[in-house]
Amino acid sequence: VTEPAVSAQVTFRSSRGRWILLASILGSGLAGIDATVVNVALPSIGRDFGVGFDSLQWTITAYTLTLASLILLGGALGDSFGRRRIFVLGVIWFAVASLLCGLAPSAGALVGARALQGIGGALLTPGSLAMIQASFVPEDRARAIGAWSGLGGVATAIGPFLGGWLIGFASWRWVFLINAPLAVVVVLVAQRHVPETRDPAGSHRIDVLGAGLGVLGLGGLTYAIIAAPSHPISSAGVWLTGLVGVVSLVGFGVAERRQQHPMMPLTIFSSAQFSAANAVTFLVYGAFGGVFFLLAVQLQVVAGFSALAAGTALLPITVVMLLLSARGGQLAQRIGPRLPMSLGPLICAAGLLLMLRIGRHARYFTDVVPPVLVLGLGLALLVAPLTATVLAAIDSEHAGVASGVNNAVARAAGLIAVAALPAVVGLTGESYTHADVFLHGFRKAILICVVLLVLAAGLAASTISNSVLGSSTVGSSAAGPSTLGSSTAGAVVAGEVAAVAAASGGPGSTDRLHCAVDGPPLSVDVPARRDGA
């Protein structure tokens, strides 16, 4: 990250530093909250528009699709044309799209506006962290990033609660409309208090081809998966869009290999440890994406919870993560990542099995809290070692690239899970309005997600090397392991990966965050890649 002159950089305790933090946290919080808040609103949206379950899926996947496909591009645009400029553009874009969501006259219009929201999120999310990295003096940078990650994680975590409250006291439309006044505050603060930075050495040749093929590939596959259950198996539209998706993804791989400045450099997958850790990420976040999408509906349609009660259901995960994630990082530092990465998914799987108790007349403290607490325990053990392994598996100068790729993998996993899982378990059409039908499908979905987590545990046990982590990998930096715990909380609660992607916070650090793209939470100190990784 290109830094302004030393005299222009700010300290953590300075007034301007706090304004920069406010703009960054509120901005990233907009995207984080909107990734989680909508799950709680799905039954209300379905009732108002009288649509089937596939339309509700698109309400989620349209946002994730554009966000996952374009977030690396958004970071590159900020590097080249100014991080504050692209951040502010993203916030304005996001606010306008939010107004379109809140005023949408139909489900189709809402889905289109959600896709536009994802584009705004892809523009603002990378810049929120990059502005902090470039603006603060090196000795305060880790502390500032810790505040950003912790408060941003909390913002993401309260999304379902906020959504439930707004739905109960107003309307689901306010889930989106509330973004507009917040965006005005962010823009005013950013324009007045955040310095402009860019990378003068960065290339202005943006990988538009890669971004386009990524959107087309993920979009084609997502449409085919969601549309297949409601169309004949011989439907040309389904087969054609699926084929376009596959061909586009193949083309994406070819294009990224040939590009001089690729959006996703494929060479980093030459590390076996990096590839294995991302495979574990895909399985784990696929399971979480599917569960959290369906659980919010299950609690309302089957268990009879209000939107507010359903929104509070996952808050215990946040508490557990805040309290215990640092311990998971410390354990991985002492004994290596293999055991935490193997045991964590198994504990999460046990939590999901306990969710099978959530049915008709389920009670919050006896049927919902126990599985959620067990799930939080597994996540606290898993996430910090997983992300540290991703970063340690490649050379330290590519830490930002690795974080961005891991972020994209996690988002893509959730996207595919939300698209595919309901179809596999028979949740289509009006099934979300029939408690018995939805309960049956939910339980089958839980078992599938348990299988994914068991596969992730087996993959970690058989492929992850304990030697991949150096002594300074997890929790040894100025930010400390608490940074890992704070950021992880919000990320996992919603399936949104809110996190820290930071270079060393020590004096004289000049490490660069590639595109400043945030991924799942990572340690501030990243060791060089180990031989044989």
Whereabouts are the PLM-identified features?
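Helix-loop junctions on the cytosolic side of multi-pass membrane transporters
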Residues: V187-G210, V254-M263, A461-S471
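Interfacial helix-loop-helix linkers and transmembrane-helix boundary segments
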Residues: G78-R85, R141-A144, P200-I206, P262-P265, ...
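Intrinsic disorder in cytosolic terminal tails and internal cytosolic loops
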Residues: V1-R16, P200, T463-A533
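Membrane-interface helix caps and helix-loop-helix hairpins in membrane proteins
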Residues: A107-G108, S171, R198-S203, A228-S234, ...
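12-transmembrane solute porter fold
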Residues: R18-I33, V38-V40, F53, S128, ...
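Transmembrane-helix bundle of Major Facilitator Superfamily
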Residues: T2-R192, G328, I335, M341, ...
